[in-house]
Regions:
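Short, flexible helix/strand-to-coil boundary loops that buttress conserved ligand/catalytic motifs
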Residues: 70, 79-82
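Interfacial aromatic-anchored transmembrane helix boundaries in multi-pass membrane proteins
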Residues: 87-89
Length: 103
């Protein structure tokens, strides 16, 4: 199982609700996504200077499925729609089965 994590900051002129609405379309538009989660940073413990505004995580059965997701036309459409609304981003994907014992 491959876990994909996407973190981002919303551009000052963008509507955060619109960004979330667009990203929430992913599971319906792109096949192969598992355990999709999307949300705003929780500042219950304060906000460190390195915090991101929002996060998305999902899983794929294989690295091949993740590659298919990256190249899928619907995923590419969502990226194009989000580009002007996101000021900064970070992406990480890793083997979720080995998450407890990273090498």
């Amino acid at each position: 199982m491959i876990r994909h994590v996407f973190l981002w900051r919303v551009a000052p002129t963008a509507d955060p609700a619109k960004v979330l609405a667009i990203l929430s379309e992913l599971p319906e538009r792109v096949p192969g996504i598992r355990n999709f989660a999307l949300g705003k940073f929780r500042d219950d413990l304060g906000t460190p200077p390195f915090a991101w505004d929002y996060g998305l995580s999902c899983e794929f059965d294989s690295i091949g499925d993740l590659a298919t997701y990256f190249e899928h036309p619907q995923h590419q459409d969502i990226i194009a729609r989000l580009e002007p609304m996101i000021s900064d981003r970070a992406v990480c994907h890793f083997d979720a089965a080995g998450a407890a014992n990273p090498e």
